[in-house]
């Protein structure tokens, strides 16, 4: 039984009695209606015999639909009170209705078809009287494949009951239908065949979608329409429903009537308008191609998307080893990626897909892959698993970077160069000649916002251990990573001094993600590692982009179908980009609130181009292969938006055609397309009707939900349900739809409203066919299934608005290009860029005012200044205060003054994005007592003096901060000539000599402060060796490794892996025991390739560490 039968037969407990009563009624009506049609007279006596009383065993309740006197022309009726038990007077009302109606028609000379219609409507009323709630629901105009229209005058009656919408679907070219442009003139048509079928004993009119009588005549049930803002309102004609939406929900459709009346004046003179607006059309064509050029970020950005897909596939294969990740969506359909919009990924196992067993349990897959991504370092906040949607997906929202213009970026370059020159002239010269942060950038450099150090950091992974790792654990950990990614892929390995954190740098970001997801092994029981990228902003490509991950293959084939269409004409992709921006800014593209998606907008655009003959039709089933094994590439190929070989004449012709097509799109869907009877479909060439798809009757109620009520004229009940179809505001355009004005519901009405609201929230099974767009591959799927009358009228309003705006507004105020203007910046620069001849380099061109990502070195600069100020404040405090008191911190006012004095641009930009507390948190600081600033965690400052060997400083300190007396005293003790204060070391040998000369008699308590000062100098110069960590104290601890051993325990023949020494960063055996040691500023490489298995590696470790008695005790504990 369909939903429509449940709707009208709710409460029926004995279906046999109901059907028998219906058949008896139909039989008696057959005998009584024939004389009435032949003699044009009727009497109550003759019609009384046609009524059969319902069975006395089970008497269901009845509801009669009454209308007020004099309410001719109204299309909707409302419920009255429910009688306790159907009695004989109610049956007499049905008898009188038939006789009085026929008598009224005979008095005014009605035709036989009208009498048959009345007799048929009377039979419908009697047959539907047996269920619990009986409705008089005549059919509205239904879809037909033929354009002719047959209409008759509406039946008027003085009785209590009037049915003003009685139309039946008629097979063939003579069936009743109406077009979108002649809806007001469409009358009511009556099908003689359907009436005869009902007279001959056809079953109840609402029992099924398609039924036949005993004689084989076709029959279609009446079409019902519901409002999408008040789900309890039901109408039998779309005109009445549209008028209801305009009357009751006019606040949400304030501009519909005004814009439609103005736009309709263009219909008779449309060809003349196009001729007069030829210059305007050319102007919009230039603007369209300017938007297309701005969205094309080049082949390099598409390569980033390819690397992100490969990285995600490595994570997914930890869940399903044979699964592959494909890119679909706009990046495939358009062939470009702008680097900002989100990317759609889908996971498919090709073998299982061809076997028919894919996808697996999508909810479990969402949970499993989400857990794997979080283990790989993805944030819990940015990763959003959506497992209870119609299509379960995983959404990733990347953290928004700071936006910076080209002018501000070059200003930062200049200030960074000047500040580096103020610190050290030699360093400034090397920075200007070799550093990518200088203003004199090389011509082959593509990324202006990335330093060499940032690229190194993006390939680095941090492993934080819960316990300190001994030599066996560290060796096993490094070996497990090398076995997963390959020994040649590992470039550097760093361990901190406490052996609880390891950082590894790889050759590519893809290998870094692979190392983040590989299984880790340890020797000690209970040891675990938390894996995450080294830096919060410099990470592999997958971490820094928005993406959606699904598990269905429909999107792959859909995207390649759109790609085939859009790449077939040069104007197709630019126009689709403009319409996508318009749909988002106008609110038409808002699937969260039940509107359309970008996919639906693209289908509308392609359907229009095919209908106009601009592009050829492509069969979705025949021309696009279904198999993904050899026909689809996981990485979409890049295709430039603008052909660089165009001549100025060819470009002008394309611009004129693009402007005309964009203007015609709005006119076509505003006036030419028949939304009442036709469907936007690419499944077949030509026109597709709603009747051919079975979409001419909509699902109006869910199973178990209350029966919808008809409205009483003058007091219509409005139930504002905040369910799936509720209006919750427009997220894209920034405006919200006002809720309909409703009165508070109490008693029975309030109970019905709350229960209906709960049912609407529980189920989204309501499918509407007011706005029909057929999906090319998913069967019986309407992409506009959530759009009712109110949302349809809103979309039509935006079509009218866009059409009028293109004809009368200037480029700065046109609503169609509102989204493109906000994203592309200056209109003049875009127009100038689009007007010239196309060049290959213009595809990736950017306007000066276009925002780009803020370089990470801006935070490094503020971090360096804050660290220096903290060190200076600590030194001042220790010089004035006695020992034993705790350092309170640096004054916040002093820190802000230092920011304004040394980095005003960075400070201003950072404060535009974060407040004071957020910025301090990003810098690794905390506010103490509302006026002092301290590090959140001082790693390596208090423990450094106790555990670090005395006299060891990092090699990157360009100029140790010692007084002249200290320098002279150290030089005199060592017997060497003192170095000049202006001379900075340029090699490791010079730093080693400086360490020997200066640090012989230097007190150990001054070591941490001087190390911090020396480290911040490296940060200010922005050298790659100093930006390996996001926090200065973490960077300090990175080079204090415990791999140093005394010369007595280290020999030249020992394996570096076993002893922990390194040729670059180890201790030179030639140095005396008390001489200061040198640690290289460049993180040391892990020596030795590890291709052995775990058993071989264990034997190797055993052989190396068994040389001392202490190591033997460790081995007995490990292998007991």
Curated annotation (Swiss-Prot):
Q: Which cofactor does it need?
A: Mg(2+); Mn(2+)
Localization terms from the record: Mitochondrion
Enumerate composition-biased segments (Polar residues).
7-16, 118-128
Asked if the keyword Metal-binding belongs to this entry, the reply reads yes
Residue numbers binding RNA = 390
Q: Which residues bind UTP?
A: 330, 341-344, 555-559, 580, 584, 598-599
What name has this protein been given in UniProt? Answer: Terminal uridylyltransferase 1
- Which species is listed as the source? Leishmania tarentolae
